[in-house]
């Protein structure tokens, strides 16, 4: 069971998603299917089709493509991390919006946090794992 988060003023459903170093805050309200990310449309913000699909796939799984508006604020990381953060935040917000969507979101693994993070650079190495080239002579 996920905690239901609603805006106290206008009743919007809220959800927060994280992926790598990206954080997305998603607000779902009844509407016509308009998606706004950091003040831009989804086509302007996510140029890559795969990034856009990560978001629209969540709406399609819920069956709410044309019936809700999304206001999204996302920061940190790159485009792939941000798309993943928005995907998870949207799934959480949709579960707050309608409790019946929890099972389809869980089955589609939209609510599963991707825990993979960048591995830190180790001392004495050039990167996280890459060492200095070995010379026998």
From Swiss-Prot:
One Pfam entry name: Ribosomal_S9
Protein name in UniProt: Small ribosomal subunit protein uS9
GO CC aspect terms: cytosolic small ribosomal subunit
UniProt record similarity statement: Belongs to the universal ribosomal protein uS9 family.
Basic residues bias spans: 118-137
Residues passing through the membrane, by range: none
NCBIfam families named among the record's database cross-references: PRK00132.1
Gene: rpsI
Keyword Glycosyltransferase found: no
Native source organism of the sequence: Rhodopirellula baltica (strain DSM 10527 / NCIMB 13988 / SH1)
Any GO MF annotation of the entry: RNA binding
SUPFAM superfamilies the record matches: Ribosomal protein S5 domain 2-like (SSF54211)
Keyword Cell inner membrane appears in the UniProt entry: no
Coiled coil: none
Region of interest: Disordered: 114-137
Lineage: Bacteria, Pseudomonadati, Planctomycetota, Planctomycetia, Pirellulales
Superkingdom, taxonomy of origin: Bacteria
Keywords carried by this UniProt record: Ribonucleoprotein, Ribosomal protein
């Amino acid at each position: 069971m996920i905690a239901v988060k609603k805006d106290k003023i206008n009743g919007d459903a809220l959800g927060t998603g994280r992926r790598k170093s990206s954080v997305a805050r998603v607000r779902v309200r009844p509407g016509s299917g308009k998606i706004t990310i950091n003040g831009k449309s989804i086509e302007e913000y996510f140029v890559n089709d795969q990034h856009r699909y990560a978001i629209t796939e969540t709406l399609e799984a819920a069956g709410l493509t044309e019936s809700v508006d999304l206001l999204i604020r996302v920061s940190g990381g790159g485009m792939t991390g941000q798309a993943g953060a928005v995907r998870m935040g949207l799934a959480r917000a949709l579960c707050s919006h309608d409790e019946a969507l929890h099972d389809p979101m869980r089955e589609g693994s939209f609510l599963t946090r991707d825990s993979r993070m960048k591995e830190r650079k180790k001392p004495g190495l050039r990167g996280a794992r890459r060492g200095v080239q070995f010379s026998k002579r």
